[in-house]
Amino acid sequence: MKRRGQVLIVVAVLIPVLLLFLAVAVDAGRIFIDRASLQRSAQAAADAGISVVAEHMVTLAVARQTIMASTPSPTPPGTMTATPVLSNIQAWLNDEDRQALTADPLRGTAVAEAIHYAQRNGVDPSQPEILRLEIHYPQAGYDPGDPSIHALRILVEIERRTTVLLAGLLGESFMDLEAAGQSEIPQR
């Protein structure tokens, strides 16, 4: 009985199986890396957009603090409301300030900054593999006068088409990946 022929058949059967496992491992690794990169890009864009809002929020609070500091304070009759701590920025804001934080000029600036940071992280909407880049600010249902809403949120959603090796052998050479990043800032 010759074993050489049996070994050759076993090797011939195992090589395609081994190559299939290798292709699956390479595809899974590539998808994992692309998805993580997309997630980091979405989160960086959301953080950049909310930083514009935070900067404007501080500007509004400092203006209000300056007004309070320059106003003479005689002893008024009745009870007084406590002055907020200087570091508690959101306590200095009123509903008009909260409305200014979601007005069109600031909304446009926040969205533009989020898009800029998405582009800096490799997500350029003009690239054909970027299927979708959506920025939602403020969150749905936000009302500046509603005291039950404690935070302003920005949500960045990205969808990118990526190439896969094994799926190409099976007829599908692309896969769509989605990621979302959300940042928020307290406003009450």
Protein language model annotation of sequence segments:
Residues M1-P16:
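Glycine-centered recognition micro-motifs in short, flexible terminal segments and loops
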Residues V7, A44-S51, H116, R120, ...:
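Charged/polar positions on well-ordered alpha helices
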Residues A28, F32, S41, A45-M57:
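N-terminal alpha-helical signal peptides/signal-anchor transmembrane segments
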Residues S37-A44, T66:
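Juxtamembrane extracytosolic/periplasmic "stalk" immediately C-terminal to the first targeting helix
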